[in-house]
């Protein structure tokens, strides 16, 4: 062991402790439209993650949302209250360029339909729609990170969904979908004139 080894080890530990100290859960709000039916997203979080204003990098994290409900028309059943939950399949990160343009690496989500009420609640698990691939881009500023995907696809489920798979597929599957998310926090763009999003290929 050289005399530099302890110094390097201490430096590495300090770097790790500093990085973890800045990790946070960023509050998330937004709205979602699925097959033409719109509603607010339940208040969620993105993290544990940290934003570096010097580079514009938002470190790897995941969206977490609680259960929520939406009323949708279902063929043969009328207006049905759907209790659902969105979950992220794998972490993603984001980049804010010096001009404020922002993009997140591809986000794969799962939409789980937990119950439907017509009007009595009926359990539908398992009933998963995945992957729902989101390409989120937008802007970063001191007031927050605003991202959207104006046209994503909900794939069909092959789960039984409590015997209502065909009706739920008809109600949810398609391309007439959009999502907006707002991450609360200071996402001031970095100084400089390099658009890192296009250099790193986040926009592809």
Descriptions of predicted regions:
Residues 1-8:
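Bacterial N-terminal signal peptides that target proteins for export
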Residues 9-17:
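Bacterial N-terminal signal peptides
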Residues 18-23:
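Sec/Tat signal peptide C-region and signal peptidase I cleavage site
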Residues 24-195:
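Extracytosolic secretory-pathway proteins
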Residues 199-203:
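Ser/Thr-rich, Pro/Gly/Ala-heavy low-complexity intrinsically disordered linkers and tails
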